[in-house]
Amino acid sequence: MSAARRDGTLPWLRPDTKTQVTIEYKHDNGAVVPLRVDTIVVSAQHAEDITTEQLRKEIKEKIIKKIQPSGLFIIGGPQGDAGLTGRKIIVDTYGGWGAHGGGAFSGKDFSKVDRSAAYVGRWIAKSLVNAGLARRALVQLSYAIGVAEPLSIYVDTYGTSDKTSDQLVEIIRNNFDLRPGVIVRELNLDRPIYLQTAKNGHFGTNQSFTWEQPKTLKF
């Protein structure tokens, strides 16, 4: 959709376009393996001079099949969402599939662990999976105001690791310095990188983000 707007394939498209993909998974000893895409829904912000019928026809032909369930969508962004705070934190991260601490990212600088610790948690989880220590991992970090080190570290691998949670936590402690200032330095969070987080979420879609590049672990 974004490419079609930029290259003129669908010139009436506007930036605030949302997609929802429903996927069927199977459980495989704690890991989840995608089987098929069940439904794809596209809600596209558009110019005023295109009808819903024309919009549906063009997107069906040029993009995908199941689109625009709510009809017209001319006004988008914060103007269309009164009370919008810090962007939508679930769709920005794991879409309800993983856990979220509840703090928004956008609008906060990198010194806030709502943002920096969420990024390093992603980095840790990807590094564990990349190292073959698990096929699936949830990493939970707990911080307190004025305390540099996390109060607790928890890992759930859903039965996909041959190591205990305590053993994995020890590996994490030996490979990652989780003080906020160090997180900022190691992930280059003080650089002008945040423009790209304003679209398509913070996790998974843009592999150039530092937290998407697994660290080589020593264990």
Annotate each PLM feature.
Residues 45-62, 95-109, 166-190, 216-219:
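Hydrophobic transmembrane alpha-helix bundles
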